[in-house]
Amino acid sequence: MKHKLITLSILILTFCSSFGQSPDLPNDFLSKEWHKERRQKLRESMLANSVAIFFANAVRNRSNDVDYVYHQDPDFFYLTGYREPEAVLLIFKDNQTAANGTVYNEIIFVQERNALREMWTGRRIGAEGTKNLLGFEQAFNGSQFKKYNVEFSKFSEILFYDFQNDVRDNPRDSTDLYSLIEQFKEKVNYPKKDNSLSVAKEQPKNNLNLRGLHSLMAGLRGVKTTEEIELLRKAVMISCVGQVEVMKAIEPGMSEREIQGIHEYVFKKYQAEDLGYPSIVGGGHNGCILHYTDNYKPSLDNKELILMDLGAEFHGYTADITRTIPVNGKFSPEQKQIYELVLLAQEASMKACKPGVELSHLTVVSREVVNKGLVELGIIQTETEKHLFFPHGVSHHIGLDVHDKGHRVLEPNMAITIEPGVYIPNNSATDPKWWGIAVRIEDDFLITKEGCELLSGYAPRTVADIEAMMKQPSPLQKFKLPELEPKKK
């Protein structure tokens, strides 16, 4: 027994000394100086005598003792670069003085190093790593948050987001996210559970502000820096390559899940850490479901279209690109008419896209083109008919979220999508020749001083270019797997 304890102690000491920042991590993440400058930009936009508080995302459970892969809260990542759970960040408008005389204007509390835990669930950087790697001067373990003295009552405004209701309580851990939140609530006299809604919906009679932070962060995150644009370009290019490789490889009889797998293999091949959102791969009438993520159709029909809406997430930044292609490599006359109408609508919105324009105007432009075209095709009777076949807006910001924060009026260096679509479900009140046709074309754009730059042009958009690309050979055509069940003789 003594020998086992000694061995375990040596193992733990080894983990303590060697773990922290992984030597295998890429070195092209946003720099600590970049994140520090973002915190300063937020500070400059805050009111005098105010403080902003951010909590790391919760760890979310998949089932039983298996959790989902952790994904940091985008605001928290934007301001810190910290990618671990169980942390809280405080940013002060004005300098504060600690009991020991230290002057500071920001402070972060993070997950404490624990060698045994790291052996099971991965490296942590701890308070010292947060100082050395992320550039914080004031960084402490989460266990110190409860007793750290911040006189919240003196602030004119305490900015924070209201809390999610799915934060788990680990009763054996007094430094988990649940505990940090409860300790914060006690510090700021947060209303009891039955009164919590009044904090957000009524003019507060205290100094708690649950509304103001969103607008401040939207102002920052909506306009991308040079470094962010570089990461977005890479995420977009990776996603475009996925679309191109599917165009080359697709054959009738493939499954939706197989097509999804080709896209996501390309993402991983280029070191994209994650998907920006669940992949949408809808063959035929499944494309009429706007956010179809089942992707379980076992065999794609020779004569149908497939709508593919996917985005790689690279170093936190996500693309959002949709292409609709014919499974057999050739658009039918009806498919071509709908596709070219949607493309015409997108190009009209592209021309209208420039600084000073509201995002909603891009939808108006696309809708006018689509409605006129649907009347000409006899699919609807009047241009003012209810939007049965084009039920969504065409534009949103992209960045750390696929539907990123940002203000509605366009400015240079904003990154947005333009994504008109037409969806005609089976049994619609129109000629059956149109049934099951679903087309969406979605591209990513960078707003410039004069207009916009198409970021996702590597993936073909026109009928001619798509059909030409689908004639190209694919390396995946040689990739054959054995049958799981031998064919019966």
Q: In which residue ranges do the predicted regions lie?
A:
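Active-site neighborhoods and metal-handling regions in enzymes and metal-associated proteins
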Residues: Q21-K489
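Bacterial Sec-dependent N-terminal signal peptides
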Residues: M1-P23
